Amino acid sequence: MNALNAAMTVIGAGSYGTALAITLARNGHHVVLWGHDPKHIATLQHDRCNAAFLPDVPFPDTLHLESDLATALAASRDILIVVPSHVFGQVLRQIKPLMRPDARLVWATKGLEAETGRLLQDVAREALGDDIPLAVISGPTFAKELAAGLPTAISLAATDPQFAEDLQHLLHCGKSFRVYINPDFIGVQLGGAVKNVIAIGAGMSDGIGFGANARTALITRGLVEMSRLGAALGADPETFMGMAGLGDLVLTCTDNQSRNRRFGMMLGQGMDVQSAQDKIGQVVEGYRNTKEVRVLAQRLGVEMPITEEIYQVLYCGKIAREAALTLLGRARKDERSSN
């Protein structure tokens, strides 16, 4: 591969970053995958698969591993960031001096900025300036199913229409991967952060043993909280009925491939927060997302009772069953009430 002719450079060689790189390469594109640990990248290169997360999916020949960040970023103008939300800004500051002048940035990271609750678009603008085209992809995607080529659909939003069309062309595969362009840049970002929080709550409910009725009620009211917060930010309400909203919410709340759901189930069964995180063994994005979403909601004056009770469990030592009873004991109200 010539150093300057890759279709995409993927930053982040975990399960999801690897799955997206495989998908792009399977579409016939040359793709560079970079990770922060040179030993991990060397292992991926030797094995030609991600044995830790996706052991049964061999890498296409057009997927190239790279441990040198400058080389990886020189390979393509288009950069796909797939890292946990709490290091998103740090990674952008790291890559900025190495990016090509014509670079465009897209991320699959789901979350908000740690501590501040800012949207990742604001973090990107602060780190990279106002001129670079930005995009985000989000939706119901488990890495194993995506890498295996099972049917999957996502939403894509971008600040530049041409960038959106180019990304759709790169990612979309009629056999297995549908990519829907959505003009709502704010809503597509927000859905992925809030659904992680609600998924912890759904897991708690099931861990307590409340059953399918309770889980469904929690998902539905969680969607209300997502939509309410989105409205305060100026998002399009229809976005939350799409892949980046309802789609991702249902997937994450109902399937045990979701780390957030499994984490919540352990809490509902009485396990403490640290032990549950240790047992999961990977990043539980919803743990940090809960604090970030709460900060954002408080700043905007948006009431999010489910998010608040999950926060109380994660950060204040409240028992999951007590949090559930607090929600059930709330005053009667109209279903369409704003609080």
Curated annotation (Swiss-Prot):
Positions of sn-glycerol 3-phosphate binding: K110, G139, T141, K195, D248, S258, R259, N260
Keyword Secreted attributed: no
Binding residue positions for NADPH: S15, Y16, H36, K110, A143, R259, V283, E285
Subcellular location: Cytoplasm
EC number(s) per entry: 1.1.1.94
GO biological process: carbohydrate metabolic process; glycerol-3-phosphate biosynthetic process; glycerol-3-phosphate catabolic process; glycerophospholipid biosynthetic process
Family matches, as Pfam families: NAD_Gly3P_dh_C, NAD_Gly3P_dh_N
MF annotations from Gene Ontology: glycerol-3-phosphate dehydrogenase [NAD(P)+] activity; NAD binding
Pathway membership: Membrane lipid metabolism; glycerophospholipid metabolism
NCBIfam families: PRK00094.1-1, PRK00094.1-2, PRK00094.1-4
Protein name per its UniProtKB record: Glycerol-3-phosphate dehydrogenase [NAD(P)+]
Species of provenance: Klebsiella pneumoniae (strain 342)
